[in-house]
């Protein structure tokens, strides 16, 4: 059974990792500080992924699997990879990849309850393959609770930069803003956001458009939840986690003032985990804000509630346990 083989391989890989960790501790090599500790962690995770990706599964061109008792994965594969090439050659992919594809299909089908959008089942966001799921609720709650700028009180306009699933645009619509633009440059994210906005009945309030960051027009409120960690993503889903050279963060700050209406605000939603991992300092962030001609009006903080923040066995627990997610209210200086 392929799944049992994968589970056995996971146990073996994790057992070897624990053995190496214990051996290093006995040799006095465990006291590695950040950011080196984080880089070693990513290296270990990459090695683990490479080993777990070594179990391969054959596919026919129509996405059927020529193995006994193989499941029907046509719908899941079509969502992730596009329509099958019926007359094409047989292909091979890793079991880990296909498990991810099937898992993404289930998330897309069931959806994720977002309390900020009301009561289930009418509050569900359906993430697509390769689009980050809104499983961390604290940043969504910050957007729900932050006081809207006065400029938004009458026919206010808002932009959700890098909308992903469209969840933050939907929260803004839930707050009765009626002129919202949700932008992204990833075709999967655009399709995903469009589906969710229509499914929630918010199509008249929210327009989904393709843009690198900002749309052509100005707005009274511009929200951005960029990837939180400086680093190079190694997969599509990691683009929601890692921001190479803090490129998106810097670009948002640099262009914000020019795209705000008078009296408007920019809301930057950002975790300080990068600071605890020593990948970025608070002084650097404040310097980028000042350099962009912006000022900080206020900051709202929320403690993460996800499992890793409380898991003492996590390799980065000492940093994760101190993490705080903040909504920075910014305005032109």
Predicted regions and their residues:
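SAM-dependent Rossmann-like transferase core, predominantly class I methyltransferases
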Residues: 74-171, 320-322
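A short glycine-rich, Lys/Arg-flanked "PGG" loop and its adjoining helix->strand segment in the class I
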Residues: 249-262
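Mobile active-site "lid"/loop adjacent to the S-adenosyl-L-methionine
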Residues: 187-189, 226-251
